Design a protein with these regions (language model features):
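Short secondary-structure transition/capping motifs
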Residues: 7, 33-34, 47, 62-65
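Charged, often Cys/His-bearing segments associated with DNA-binding zinc-finger transcription factors
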Residues: 1-32, 83
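Short, flexible loop/turn motifs enriched in small residues
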Residues: 12, 39, 126-130
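Short, surface-exposed loop/turn segments at secondary-structure junctions
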Residues: 30-34, 232-235
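Short, amphipathic alpha-helical "recognition" segments used to contact nucleic acids or chromatin
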Residues: 37-51
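Ser/Thr-centered flexible coil motifs
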Residues: 11, 37, 198-200
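Short, well-ordered secondary-structure "scaffold" segments embedded in the functional core
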Residues: 57, 61-74, 78-254
Length: 254
């Protein structure tokens, strides 16, 4: 196997942040000596998540076994996901910030699937995956991500399962969303349906899209972490993985 030097498009701040989390965790649990120190473990995890390199590739690059690599990654992802904001915390923060509205959007994390995995097949995206709900600010900064549900689950149903609609109403926060959320209630504003709309509805539709567009960039930010472009681990871990990446993305953005 050949080796080469490569750049990782992340700041040293993010590396230091994750290293600190791992260092404190090792001290708390009284871990014995490990092959990689906290900084090296943090770098390994960031390479895997950001670049999407396989366990075999990462393990070879850091000179450790595949099983150890997997344990290092799972440990870091679990610790990061615990720091992800809860829905009520995210909504309180949005309220304090005074955002005029939020943006709710669903995304699909692709997984390796076969014909027998029908519950994971998304008719909307025409592929197997896990449904994740994302709340973002008007400028596209992700605020909160949900757990994962099979890809066949409709966005509106997913929003109800995670209690998003009820919490938005309780917080009295207006939220913009696409047509997949028709019927979500008065606090979730969606575009008009149908082709032959009057001029007033067409104008409202265009204004809605203009406001919603920047907010939907939150999903693009999360999926800039290439591990989310096709998940090869257990699909049930998708939600935790996205929450961990949310924490890293917010750290990277400063």
């Amino acid at each position: 196997m050949l080796f080469y030097r490569a750049a990782l498009p992340l700041s040293s701040r993010t590396l230091s942040y994750l290293s600190g989390i791992l260092r404190r965790h090792r001290k708390t649990i009284g871990t014995p000596w490990r092959r990689l120190n906290p900084g090296q473990q943090a770098l390994l995890v960031l390479v895997h998540l950001r670049k999407g390199e396989t366990l075999t590739e990462v393990a070879a690059g850091f000179g450790i076994g595949i099983a150890t690599t997997w344990r290092y990654i799972r440990e870091a992802v679990t610790l990061l996901a615990r720091r992800s904001p809860r829905l009520d915390q995210a909504l309180r923060a949005a309220k304090r910030a005074g955002y005029p509205y939020l943006v709710l959007d669903g995304t699909l994390i692709p997984i390796e699937g076969v014909a027998a995995d029908r519950p994971y097949y998304s008719g909307k995206h025409k592929k197997h995956g896990m449904n994740i709900q994302v709340l973002a600010t008007p400028d596209g900064t992700p605020l909160w991500t949900s757990g994962s549900l099979p890809g066949s689950v409709h966005d509106l149903k997913a929003a109800r399962i995670w209690g998003i609609l009820r919490r938005l109403q309780a917080a009295d926060l207006v939220t913009l969303a696409d047509k997949g959320y028709v019927g979500a209630g008065e606090h979730v504003r969606v575009p008009y349906k149908g082709r032959d709309k009057p001029a007033s509805q067409k104008a409202a539709h265009a204004a809605h899209a203009k406001l919603r567009g920047p907010g939907e960039r939150a999903n693009a930010q999360l999926q800039s972490w290439r591990i989310l472009r096709k998940l090869r681990s257990c699909p049930l871990l998708a939600g935790q993985l996205v929450k961990a990446i949310l924490v890293l993305q917010l750290c990277e953005a400063g």
